[in-house]
């Protein structure tokens, strides 16, 4: 291949390379949050692939900055209850806990303990709780949502 063809091929492939490099980028991640690789990362509790961007959650903290990813806020609620002895740092105020806002499709993240929740949305694991940024008619806080999830069981 001569020099002229090599340069022409490189110029022709540049837009393709730029388009492909943008494919993996999805959403703006809050400071400190580890990126969730949609359709590849799995929920630490149920081992399902995290696909539905409207219900994902993430927990991060401890001395080693451990990250736990969830496909459903309900899985996170049970993880917090079941693993409290193994990871006591999860109860500390410095622990970061995010949940995807239902209308944000993985683009908007809320602090899980400050978010409001609405029931009746079909979530991946059937806990059917969705996070919203502002209180709506019939919405409730994190503690009430937690009680609903634990009462449902699984």
Feature names for model-found ranges:
Residues 27-86:
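N-terminal secretory signal peptides
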Residues 66, 104-108, 124-127:
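Short, surface-exposed beta-strand/loop "edge" segments at domain boundaries and coil↔beta transitions
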């Amino acid at each position: 291949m001569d020099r002229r063809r090599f340069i022409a091929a490189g110029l022709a492939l540049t837009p393709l390379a730029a388009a492909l490099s943008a494919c993996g980028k999805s959403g703006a991640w809050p400071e400190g949050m580890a990126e969730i690789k949609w359709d590849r990362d799995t929920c630490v509790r149920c081992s399902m692939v995290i696909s539905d961007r409207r219900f994902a959650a993430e927990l991060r903290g401890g001395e080693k900055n451990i990250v736990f990813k969830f496909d459903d806020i309900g899985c996170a609620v049970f993880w917090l209850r079941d693993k409290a002895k193994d990871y006591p740092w999860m109860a500390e105020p410095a622990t970061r806990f995010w949940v995807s806002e239902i209308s944000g499709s993985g683009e908007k993240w809320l602090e899980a303990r400050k978010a409001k929740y609405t029931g009746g949305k079909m979530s991946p694991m059937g806990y059917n709780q969705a996070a919203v940024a502002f209180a709506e008619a019939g919405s409730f806080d994190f503690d009430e949502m937690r009680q609903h999830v634990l009462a449902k069981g699984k």
